[in-house]
Amino acid sequence: MSEEADHNRAIFCSSLSGNDPMKHFCALVLALSAASFSANALAAQPLLSPAELQAKLSDANVRVIDIRDPKSYAANHIPGAVNAPYGTWRGPANNPGELPGLPKLTTLVQSLGLTPSIHAVVVSSGADATDFGASARVYWTLKVLGLKELSVLNGGVRAWTTAGLPQNNTAVQVAASSFQPQIDKSLVATKEELVARVKSGDAALIDARPADFFKGDTRHVAASVPGTLQGAVNVEHDKWFAPGTSTFVSTDQAQKVAASSPIDPAKETVSFCNTGHWAATNWFAMSEVLGQKNVKLYAGSMVEWSKDPNGLPMANVPSRPKQLLIDAKFWAEKTFK
């Protein structure tokens, strides 16, 4: 609703007598309109430029979460940022994409002083497009926990530094919160759910990995079998960035990327990769930037899927001799590195 329309409605309502039945209706419409405007005005943008973030640093309700390693954080960081390294948001070594349990995540977000009223801004190094996946994965995790006021610093610390904005090396500690999150299952695709989806073919399965993974020419070191989900299409995670950077493109450009990709916004969509990292970028693009309402992330992704003892359906699985060659390559890299 436009401000002009609201103004005209207000004039009409004020012209009604106090006992006119329309008076109450008008008041209700105006209140709902104001609430809608207020919610839209307060809603956090999914992406913030360095200048936009700098303008918010004096706000006590803004919490900058630096997910780089402790050494990088200690050297220099955005003033006021707290450190929560990316690894603390991830699963175990044998299934790093696994969403940690609620008790662990509760302790983590409470230690950062997060509550629904805090605007959390996730910051990674900004090294490249792959690095953006870390910010997107933490953003997704926070949203899964019920937090709504969320943003990612577009371009990360590299963009902040390039902009010549201030940094310091003062470690920041914040008061813990008592926030008790709950898992929003509408954002999470489980392996069990995906088994049914693959069988029925009623969901769009988007593989965010580079083409050599999708085609089965290689695999993640923790995966058992190369290949992809049966029925999946490939939308590489780095399509959403200015070439050679971790700077996410404009919404208009993102719409063009989506239009040229095998993305069907009318279908429920599941984003996956090896460990739910690159997939988080595609989820972020579709759900948060483009506003698609029916996008889930399969956190365990191909590492979890390929290890299932029941041998779940896969496509682009190479021949046994080719798999042995891939295994030999991993062995050589590990042995002679």
Identify the meaning behind each predicted range.
Residues 6-8, 20:
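Intrinsic-disorder-associated, low-complexity terminal segments enriched in Asp/Asn/His/Tyr and depleted
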Residues 8-10, 25:
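Positively charged, low-complexity intrinsically disordered regions
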Residues 17-27:
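Positively charged n-region of N-terminal signal peptides that target proteins for export
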Residues 26-34:
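Sec-dependent N-terminal signal peptides
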Residues 36-39:
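N-terminal signal peptide c-region/cleavage motif recognized by signal peptidases
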Residues 41-63, 70-204, 208-337:
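Rhodanese-like catalytic fold shared by cysteine-dependent sulfurtransferases
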